[in-house]
């Protein structure tokens, strides 16, 4: 199942027209663009100058000049390439997005021609500076597409604003979490984005997650079609977050492995950490996959609220599903149509059925076309969606086909939903 621009209103979903040309495309396999029109384009290149007018790539502005000039409904169009942010030892070099777009008229920042604009903050491997985020998004209604943030001195992106969208973005090799939402950030959408190899030297890997909608994050934050792998701590970390987070069609794998030769390494290694600190967070995760994580694939982590867990697959984690902690009175987890393979599942205080460890059929390797987990890191499809491979797809004669329970908002093609993250068509 593809998640192309999921969660986003129709007007924004296909992205935007740019003077009826094809410098941007909703689907990079075609030259077509559709959606809404921008009021103004600011052309930006790595060698751009504040003295240029930014009317074309022949006279590109600098990124900072374009940010200062851009208004709601306007586009900062980035020439693909590397935008190097100078590093000075002991000092931060954050880019702050503190102005705001408007509902229906965000400020767009996007790479041209389906390319990638890489913002390299240049921090050496062992160096970090407190709060030296790469992107610090305090404003509202920004729309980022085709952007990468790497080697930031702390979080790759730290989001406290609201109604922002990150599409087909990547956050990697930063000195803390790839993308974190905190301190009131609400109604942010992260779609078809990757976070990998983030590590915090400050605390020996115990803080750097892939994606972190945590603590004081506000309501309405959603993730779809995202991957988080080989981060020093967790893939997705919803620690101490009472506001509901929705995660769909996302993958978390090989988190918590010491790739940094840190003799004091302290990463946790959960795929999806779905709570913490006894906060009551009624999060929802569907159609997602966890494998090869050091600790747990799907982790309650002392969430005192009931979590909804539907049609997920967990394989060869330390523990596949860890939901053994108590919840507050009146709270209960909801588990349906999940698969656990080559690992244990502990699910207490739950309304649970049609899972492979309870009333559903027991899963085995023969139920799947492939368990080759190297397929998880191949390139995304041209439209930015996760690659459609044989990994964890059900085999023709799998006993997991049509073995699930019908659920609202869970589509299926047979007489009933299949078990696991991927419906066999």
Curated annotation (Swiss-Prot):
Keywords: Calcium, Disulfide bond, Lyase, Metal-binding, Secreted, Signal. SUPFAM superfamilies: Pectin lyase-like. GO terms for biological process: pectin catabolic process. Pathway: Glycan metabolism; pectin degradation; 2-dehydro-3-deoxy-D-gluconate from pectin: step 2/5. The active site is at 273 (proton acceptor). Ca(2+) 1 binds at residues 209, 233-234, 237. Residues 1-25 form the signal peptide. It catalyses: Eliminative cleavage of (1->4)-alpha-D-galacturonan to give oligosaccharides with 4-deoxy-alpha-D-galact-4-enuronosyl groups at their non-reducing ends. Gene3D superfamilies: Single-stranded right-handed beta-helix, Pectin lyase-like (2.160.20.10). GO terms for cellular component: extracellular region. Belongs to the polysaccharide lyase 9 family. This is Pectate lyase L. It comes from Dickeya chrysanthemi (Pectobacterium chrysanthemi). The lineage of its organism: Bacteria, Pseudomonadati, Pseudomonadota, Gammaproteobacteria, Enterobacterales. The gene is pelL.
């Amino acid at each position: 199942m593809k998640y192309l621009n999921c969660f986003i209103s129709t007007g924004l979903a296909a992205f935007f027209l740019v003077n009826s040309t094809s410098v941007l495309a909703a689907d990079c396999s075609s030259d077509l663009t559709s959606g809404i029109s921008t009021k103004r384009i600011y052309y930006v290149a790595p060698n751009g100058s504040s003295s240029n007018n930014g009317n074309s790539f022949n006279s590109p502005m600098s990124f900072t000049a374009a940010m200062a000039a851009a208004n709601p409904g306007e586009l900062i169009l980035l020439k693909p390439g590397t935008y190097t942010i100078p590093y000075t030892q002991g000092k931060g070099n954050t880019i702050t997005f503190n102005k705001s777009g408007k509902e229906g008229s965000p400020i767009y920042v996007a790479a041209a021609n389906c390319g990638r604009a890489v913002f390299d903050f240049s921090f050496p491997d062992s160096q970090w500076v407190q709060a030296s985020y790469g992107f610090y998004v305090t404003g509202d209604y920004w729309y980022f597409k085709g952007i990468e943030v790497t080697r930031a001195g702390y979080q790759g992106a730290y989001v406290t604003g609201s109604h922002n969208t990150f599409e087909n973005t990547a956050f990697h090799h930063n000195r803390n979490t790839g993308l974190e939402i905190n301190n009131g950030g609400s109604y942010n959408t992260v779609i078809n984005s990757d976070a990998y190899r983030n590590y915090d030297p400050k605390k020996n890997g115990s803080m750097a997650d892939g994606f972190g909608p945590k603590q004081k994050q506000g309501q309405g934050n959603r993730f779809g079609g995202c991957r988080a792998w080989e981060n020093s701590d967790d893939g997705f970390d919803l620690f101490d977050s009472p506001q509901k987070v929705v995660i769909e069609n996302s993958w978390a794998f090989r988190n918590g492995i010491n790739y940094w030769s840190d003799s004091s390494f302290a990463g946790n290694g959960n795929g999806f950490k779905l709570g913490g600190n006894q906060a009551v967070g009624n999060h929802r995760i569907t159609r997602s996959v966890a494998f090869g994580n050091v600790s747990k694939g799907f982790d309650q982590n002392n969430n005192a609220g009931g979590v909804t867990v539907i049609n997920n697959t967990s394989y060869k984690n330390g523990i596949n599903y860890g939901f053994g902690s108590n919840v507050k009175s009146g709270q209960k987890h909801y588990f349906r149509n999940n698969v656990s393979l080559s690992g244990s599942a502990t699910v207490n205080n739950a309304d649970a059925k049609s899972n492979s460890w309870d009333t559903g059929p027991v899963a085995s390797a023969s139920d799947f076309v492939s368990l080759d987990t190297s397929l998880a890191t191949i390139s995304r499809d041209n439209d930015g969606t996760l690659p459609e491979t044989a990994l964890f797809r059900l085999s023709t004669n799998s006993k997991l086909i049509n073995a699930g329970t019908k659920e609202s908002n869970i589509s299926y093609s047979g007489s009933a939903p299949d078990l696991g993250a991927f419906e066999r068509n």
